[in-house]
Amino acid sequence: SVVAGSAAFRKISRLLQKSARSKWDIDVMSSPALQGVIRSLRIYHGPHAPRDAMDQLYRLFVEPGALVFDIGAHVGDRISSFRRLGARVIAVEPQPLLFSALNHIHGRDPLVELLDRAVGSDAGVRELFVNTTNPTVSTLSEEFVNQARGARGWEDQIWDGRVPIEIVTLDGLIARYGTPSFIKID
């Protein structure tokens, strides 16, 4: 697990900045986006992250050796919990910078498979609306973006980037990896 202020945390931050400059459209992967991901890393992998409580909750559903799907993996704190419990994890995250963070944190774990995709009712390709200053609220829903525009609580949120993303279905994931004992979706 990555702890804020640690050498591993600083290394991941540097790698994310390098990835943002070299791999994706700089407008989508701007400095505010990096700050949003770094903030999430601090919250969910930092010294005050609720690891014990999370493990206690998921232990009710996940046994050692279980197959777990993490749909919308964000920065991978649930992946970390599932792995601490001994599960094999298939993690899906469509947001490019969050996926890069996941890859740096969990990419070498042979019991974690990371997919830079989204899950939907139909397979295909869709446009991901990226909020570059708050990348955790990126969405496939243009309707959501339109309704959030100017809505109370969403005044400062702008979806100013777009990325084509492959869509897979739960049925497709099950056909490829098997039936999971637990699916976390958000």
Task: Give residue spans per PLM region.
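Phosphate/nucleotide-binding beta-alpha loop and adjacent structural elements of enzyme active sites
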Residues: 1-185
